[in-house]
């Protein structure tokens, strides 16, 4: 385990894809040693990031996701070798019950210039699929959305690449350390430090990138139980 610094500008909790991608991005602004410190309870990619399926796509029904996912794909494309990213594209092959929804996704992709093809009709879909896989046999397919970008990556290798990109820019990743609480300002609720089982690290800002464990930190921070969405 690395030694815990006594202070940092930003402390990030969690060594998965959220924590390390944030660290990498922040390292482009904060360039001094220990400006950005990542605290990880076990090891990088030890949680959900290490068991993710690895598919990289822009195939979500929510319109708000479209440009965000297009940006995400471009990050994967920026260094495919390091990220162990394979840009083979992505296929959504669907029966009639999904036709309308998939057509909506295609329209949204087209509106932002995201390259994809949309094939409709059972006959044309069969022809298209056999053009790629001559032993294709699935019946009842009435739409194929073929994203020309996207593909897949090897999850743990990808997270390791994020760690390497971060640490090469001066980020310190401390592993085997457990966050136990937060230090507050004397006259406010502002967080001024992170308490751990290895001591306290003072900081100006905290980023919680703990994935499914975010509830524990939410409770430590005594934030409201209900969240009202307007």
Where are these regions (language model features)?
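Gly/Ala-rich phosphate-binding loop of Rossmann-like dinucleotide-binding domains
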Residues: 23, 27, 165
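Glycine-rich FAD pyrophosphate-binding loop
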Residues: 27-49
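Beta1/beta-strand and adjacent pyrophosphate-binding region of the FAD-binding site
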Residues: 3-18, 37
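Glycine-rich beta-alpha-beta "Rossmann" dinucleotide-binding loop(s) and their flanking helix/strand
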Residues: 216-230
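Helical element adjacent to the flavin cofactor pocket in flavoenzyme catalytic cores
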Residues: 145-205, 209-216
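Conserved Rossmann-like nucleotide-cofactor binding loop
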Residues: 18, 44, 213
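Dinucleotide-binding Rossmann-like beta1-alpha1 core, especially the glycine-rich loop
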Residues: 53-132, 141
